[in-house]
Amino acid sequence: MADRGCPLEAAPLPAEVLESLAELELELSEGDITQKGYEKKRAKLLARYIPLIQDVHTEAVQAALAKYKERKMPMPSKRRSALVHSSVETYTPPDTSSASEDEGSLRRPGRLTSTLLQSHSGIEPWLDRVIQGSSTSSSASSTSSHPGGRPAAAPSASTALAGLTAHAHIDLHSAPPDVTTGLVEHSSYERPQMASVRGIPRGHGRNVLETADGVPVNSRVSSKIQQLLNTLKRPKRPPLKEFFVDDFEELLEVQQPDPNQPKPEGDQMAVLKGEPLSVGTNGPLSLLAALQLWGTTQPKAPCLTALDTAGKATCTLTYGKLWSRSLKLAYTLLNKLTSKNEPLLNPGDRVALVFPNSDPVMFMVAFYGCLLAELVPVPIEVPLTRKDAGSQQVGFLLGSCGVTLALTTDACQKGLPKAPTGEVATFKGWPPLAWLVIDGKHLTRPPKDWYPLAQDTGSRTAYIEYKTSKEGSTVGVTVSHSSLLAQCQALTQACGYTEAETLTNVLDFKRDAGLWHGVLTSVMNRMHVITIPYALMKVNPLSWIQKVCSYKARAALVKSRDMHWSLLAQRGQRDVCLSSLRMLIVADGANPWSISSCDAFLNVFQSRGLRPEVICPCASSPEALTVAIRRPPDLGGPPPRKAVLSMNGLSYGVIRVDTEEKLSVLTVQDVGQVMPGASVCVVKVDGAPYLCKTDEIGEICVNSVATGTAYYGLLGITKNTFETVPVTADGVPVSDRPFTRTGLLGFIGPDNLVFVVGKLDGLMVVGVRRHNADDIVATALAVEPMKFVYRGRIAVFSVTVLHDDRIVLVAEQRPDASEEDSFQWMSRVLQAIDSIHQVGVYCLALVPANTLPKAPLGGIHISETKQRFLEGTLHPCNVLMCPHTCVTNLPKPRQKQPEVGPASMIVGNLVAGKRIAQASGRELAHLEDSDQARKFLFLADVLQWRAHTTPDHPLFLLLNAKGTVTSTATCIQLHKRAERVAAALMEKGRLDAGDHVALVYPPGVDLIAAFYGCLYCGCVPVTVRPPHPQNLGTTLPTVKMIVEVSKSACVLSTQAITRLLKSKEAAAAVDVRTWPTILDTDDIPKKKVASIFRPPSPDVLAYLDFSVSTTGILAGVKMSHAATSALCRSIKLQCELYPSRQIAICLDPYCGLGFALWCLCSVYSGHQSVLVPPLELESNVSLWLSAVSQYKARVTFCSYSVMEMCTKGLGAQTGALRMKGVNLSCVRTCMVVAEERPRISLTQSFSKLFKDLGLPARAVSTTFGCRVNVAICLQGTTGPDPTTVYVDMRALRHDRVRLVERGSPHSLPLMESGKILPGVKVIIAHTETKGPLGDSHLGEIWVSSPHNATGYYTVYGEETLHADHFSARLSFGDTQTIWARTGYLGFLRRTELTDASGERHDALYVVGSLDETLELRGMRYHPIDIETSVIRAHRSIAECAVFTWTNLLVVVVELDGLEQDALDLVALVTNVVLEEHYLVVGVVVIVDPGVIPINSRGEKQRMHLRDGFLADQLDPIYVAYNM
């Protein structure tokens, strides 16, 4: 036994302990103590003397974790409501599941005799008998590995108890460890930040947090970000370089191989041949011949015994019954399934077998019935719902096999989902099937002399076994009659099966070893098989051992998970005896981690008759069937061996023997010898099938009669797998016969024993190293196997992000796990995997118990889990992303090169034949001298003139939500109302000319009258948006700030708003005592002013325009009378506005072009403006479009928020609007007033949607203005349509414009921002050198125009930065012209189109605001580009905003869905930003819809959002800090 690696050495017990034990036995026998009390006391007595058995790998994990001290790492914040996840099922005894489809083979026993945890409250009663698995504490017992497999000396009971209490303390109170640093010791720890909870004071009872530099931080969020930054600053292990190449086209670097990586050095391996297959002369010649022989000569011999969930035998099928029932079924299939007098089935047709795991008898009848009828059985799993995990792929299998008939039992059919007609439902992706119930009463007895003509030899297909690949596709492996016979003969020879032996089978009898041994080979040898159903194993994991005893079974067929669970349940079972077993076949012996289950099982059961040589691991695959199996010595097997391999070597595909003291080693056992009659070789995993060297890991290939022959109906993939020709290094084929690839990775060891280290399906290639999913699962389970992960259910897979595999680990957490437990466990898993595998985990997700998709026998359906992860339907309850650690192939951060001087740039452009990027609108010179221009120099004069010449001409119509006109103003009415306001200002307000007056009005005619009233008395108006009555707390301070910053001497408003400004509610938000004079203009007396003020010069200030930029800066610009009239003149010319025109305006009238269109243009041009307040659309979305239709407006203006509201709100109502008579064919131009890059997707959606209402396709365009000039571009009624170009987004990040074709990768569409207005000149200047740039070069847009603002009145926030905005000069070229800098990046491009003047048209493309751009990794990003990608990532993302905080990218997404689905978004957001922008997201914040603040123009207020985030005011659903 010593060679098995984990001996249980008996320590001699002192006399007093023996005496106490004897007393205990007596008390128990006399009934003075319960069994439970006895076991507790006995365990306490023996605890010091029983050596701790712990598998090497668990120890390695503990040792690795012991090296990490607890360190601070920000814990994700979660809203309380998002914490509640009810598990589907309460906690039941351990399941047989784990990551792989072979359910749970990876679960390791851990420490088997530690009984200390039995007194722990909270461990379920059924667990009291169970030996607790390894702990994650770094107590003395878990840190040492034991060379040679000998256990360490047992620590004293007091030490062990101290270790336990320390463990409990650490688990419950310590901070989650830092995952990104090396093994640096940090002695202090701090309690992690718990999730933020609504309604509970945050930070209560906490110490004041400090940053790394000791600076106190008063924000919970800031402290977490600081922790994250500190974590990221620390050196990582191994050092992670940023690999790159300079070539712009191929930004991402393939990771360079490590020059010190191990390389294979051995000789080239030779093909290994198994012993010859000896076919006995006296045995049956085929499987059906055997069935007929035993069925007729030994009819009473038992063939198969089925058990129920209580472990009682429900049915024993004899060979006679099997033969007669199979014949009956064959006869029915061939003769009684007729449609239109033709047989429904022909020889060779495929038939699905749908039988539950609890009914082996009917399955066996069906299988042999099909073989007798020359039909091909295709066993599949019973579908539980219409949309089972992988159902579509099973449908693909059935379709590719041409299956039209399914056999099942009565009971099974009753349990299948039904359609409303009562028929069996159609399952997702399945072809139409006929269902045949094969219970006895449904079958027809054949005539006495009837016998099928079945030919069961040769290359014809016998049956098809399904196989699910890594990607989830299900294919059918064809097994021919000759392969089937050879497999039975090889297994008989290798396992030494003899007639009438008993075999206990725990495996699925429908496929794999369970089918080959328990259904096929058993019949060949007239064996008796006891089948243990899965449901019984769940209830009683010891049932198979009990059946081995009661039936004196000679062989048993199990998986390592079965051994593991029976170990946990074996206490108190005294009468178990396994001496009858000569072979215990471990079907998943190829799983590298099965060795620990085998060793632990032997340790416990050797004293109960189990001989070490009985344990026989084997290796198999669906394609090659059985590849190798260990034989007992009496069958000629060599002694078993194990190999301790360096994990690092394995990751490079190289075998390096190591010692067990090392942490990162993999101990594997042999899976025995090659099968009789087979040849085996190992070939390279990638590329051509070259033979491996003797110290190299490769894919095992088999040549044998006994393998599968093809993937049914799939010739393409068949050739690669079943017809491989291995070649030597010189390219010479090693054999004239093809080999079959097994999908197993391994090597041939000493004594020609086969060793398997993993499966190709579980291989993840990260960088240049390979990692096995099973290995990662095993490490994660060893962290705290029994404590945290629900039933050991862990899935590991890789996803491709940024051209490399990234490891994702998903685990089901116990229903009672707390947030802190979860985070603690995740942190430790990351450390353990980093230590042992030297690889980072990209994403670690925890889901509630019982929510991962299940494979047929309770394991996890990996491909379905991966699919859900990528689709965002996994619904985790905790997520930890570590992109900073894992993503090492980002492009090199941009190094700014010394800039070329402005003069050289001009010369360069001249040499290249490029013109300087300069453009202008129509000339205004010839208009300057005209009477009208002089007459219309002051708007107050224009209004008086109109009131005198056309007094009754209507200028304004205001609509309410119902579409009715609530107020109008003719020229004379507006003039008179303005006079009244002027009189009130002079008499009541006692204001002088030049005083500033704040106008706080809702959108309407009152605001316009107040504006002209101010002009009439020489005051300077400042329009201010009124506070929102329901949201005074945030809106009133802005009003107050503008009033104060603009130095307003008086506030004009309506009665209602005046009351609001002085109310108690207002007093809570601002100091109401410091308001200047507030005048209410609702009931002012009808008075005239003695004389209307006339400004002494056109350059005198006319009004102030205040606006808050998207970066949160409040800026007021000064508009002179000259600039005001120039603006109106320019718009009049561009839009061809005359008194006979009507235009519709749906804009906020408080600043920029919106204010000019609402208040100024109608008075100047005389056209009628239909005013639609945007707020009214909240109660009637169709108001604006109905107004446009009703008044037949040729020109209309709106904001993006209005357009979005119409697109979202009226999407399904276009038909209804058409019925109401809404017709938009009158519209020539519909302009979106904006200060940003045109939102093409929104304008296109709007155009497409309302095309049905007659909206011309060319009508929609955008305007462009900014603080220095509110109207630079505006499409107007003439000139070419706006053009769209496509630019390379990657070049844009480098401040370059690279034009590409539509649809090319990384292309970004940019639409021209309307036409440059008359009198406006635009040039593109370099942002730093201020030199002029060439055509199609990206730079800052500079503007010169008579309607430029004359300067900032004040900039609240960043005064110093803006001094030169209005008086910039070029550093080279035309250095005389005074320009205003817009602060926007863009470029000019001369198009092939012609203007009205006949000149070629210059298009201006706005890329984005310079203030908003994010400088990350030396590149310039525009937030909108990242946000567009994020919104596309998942249908539940309603809106998104990004900003930076100390070099971390923060992404805020609004969730339009269920709160419990919020965490799905974290990984998708991180993935998409990495893939499309090469950026690592630092923090993902998930919030409710409407949290991202948006201004009246529909622009996101990212800086307000940032302030709210840092002040912890967003009430997020979840905040994920990416490591």
Swiss-Prot record:
It holds the Pfam family DMAP_binding. Residues 72-110, 132-158 are annotated as: Disordered. It catalyses: acetate + ATP + CoA = acetyl-CoA + AMP + diphosphate. The modification Phosphothreonine is found at T92, T115. Detected in heart, liver, spleen, lung, kidney and brain with highest levels in brain (at protein level). In adult cortex, preferentially expressed in excitatory neurons. Broadly expressed in neuronal, reproductive and vascular tissues as well as in heart, kidney, liver and lung with expression detected in neurons, mesenchyme, endothelium, smooth muscle cells and cardiomyocytes. Expressed in ectoderm-derived tissues in the developing embryo. Expressed in the developing nervous system. It is found in: Cell membrane; Mitochondrion; Cell projection, Dendritic spine. Residues 9-105 form the DMAP1-binding domain. GO terms for molecular function: acetate-CoA ligase activity. It is an enzyme of class 6 (ligase). It is a peripheral membrane protein. One of its GO terms (cellular component) is glutamatergic synapse. Its main location: membrane. Residues 134-158 have a biased composition (Low complexity). Interacts with FSTL1; DIP2A may act as a cell surface receptor for FSTL1. Interacts (via N-terminus) with CTTN (via SH3 domain); the interaction promotes acetylation of CTTN and is required for proper synaptic transmission. Interacts with SHANK3. Catalyzes the de novo synthesis of acetyl-CoA in vitro. Promotes acetylation of CTTN, possibly by providing the acetyl donor, ensuring correct dendritic spine morphology and synaptic transmission. Binds to follistatin-related protein FSTL1 and may act as a cell surface receptor for FSTL1, contributing to AKT activation and subsequent FSTL1-induced survival and function of endothelial cells and cardiac myocytes. This is Disco-interacting protein 2 homolog A. It comes from Mus musculus (Mouse). The lineage of its organism: Eukaryota, Metazoa, Chordata, Craniata, Vertebrata.
